[in-house]
């Protein structure tokens, strides 16, 4: 069934507008907001679903509310950050008449401060995720620019061993320093596996269910 003529005309007008280069910067900001919202849902919803049902107590309603809240906050903040970053980046380029590398840093610095500056669990997870990748990238950039000598052997196995050694040492002896969700995961792996009463909580369940 064909669309009504009015709807076809509207779609043609919208598509014509979207193809005009003079509106590209503004439209890119809008699509960036859209992509940020969608990506936030894709990333947070599965993570919140797994973590909530594995480690959170409460009724099904409370768990679903927690999942929806975490997903909404992540999606909203990421969408607003992309919107702010692209807007500030475009504004700097427009004012100066050209694009500089510093524009990216300043736009993201301001956006990050405004949207991810609050110290909460979600922002903490996002920042730690980025921290590891930024450090990796800076090391590679240092090698690429000649500031760090290129090794003739692969440092990955040593890096892996040090990281795992440190994280288990911190968990066993300085647990409060670790991020809460990491504490929960490691408790499930390394402490809950020390306790069982019968076959049900040895293989089937993590913890025994009290008899009613």
Curated annotation (Swiss-Prot):
One example of a Gene Ontology biological process annotation: ether lipid metabolic process
Localization annotation: Peroxisome membrane
UniProt-listed InterPro entries: Pmp4
Protein name: Peroxisomal membrane protein 4
Keyword Iron-sulfur in record: no
Sugar attachment sites: 206
Protein keywords: Glycoprotein, Membrane, Peroxisome, Transmembrane, Transmembrane helix
Membrane topology: Multi-pass membrane protein
UniProt similarity note: Belongs to the peroxisomal membrane protein PXMP2/4 family.
Subunit-structure text: Interacts with PEX19.
Domain of life: Eukaryota
Gene giving rise to this polypeptide: Pxmp4
GO cellular component, one term: peroxisomal membrane
Transmembrane segments: 97-117, 153-173
């Amino acid at each position: 069934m064909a669309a009504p003529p009015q709807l076809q005309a509207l779609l043609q007008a919208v598509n014509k507008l979207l193809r005009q280069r003079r509106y590209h910067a503004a439209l890119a900001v809008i699509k960036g907001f859209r992509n940020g919202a969608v990506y936030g849902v894709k990333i947070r919803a599965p993570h919140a679903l797994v973590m909530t049902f594995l480690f959170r107590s409460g009724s099904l309603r409370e768990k679903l509310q927690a999942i929806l809240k975490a997903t909404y906050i992540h999606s909203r903040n990421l969408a607003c950050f992309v919107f702010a970053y692209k807007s500030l980046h475009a504004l700097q380029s427009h004012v100066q008449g050209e694009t500089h590398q510093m524009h990216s840093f300043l736009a993201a610095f301001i956006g990050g401060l405004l949207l991810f500056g609050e110290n909460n669990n979600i922002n903490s997870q996002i920042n730690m995720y980025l921290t590891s990748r930024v450090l990796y990238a800076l090391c590679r950039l240092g090698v690429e620019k000649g500031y760090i000598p290129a090794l003739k052997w692969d440092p990955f196995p040593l890096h892996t061993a040090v990281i795992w050694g440190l994280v288990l040492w911190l968990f066993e002896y300085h647990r409060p320093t670790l991020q809460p969700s990491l504490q929960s995961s490691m408790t499930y792996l390394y402490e809950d596996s020390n306790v069982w009463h019968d076959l049900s909580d040895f293989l089937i369940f993590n913890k025994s269910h009290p008899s009613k």
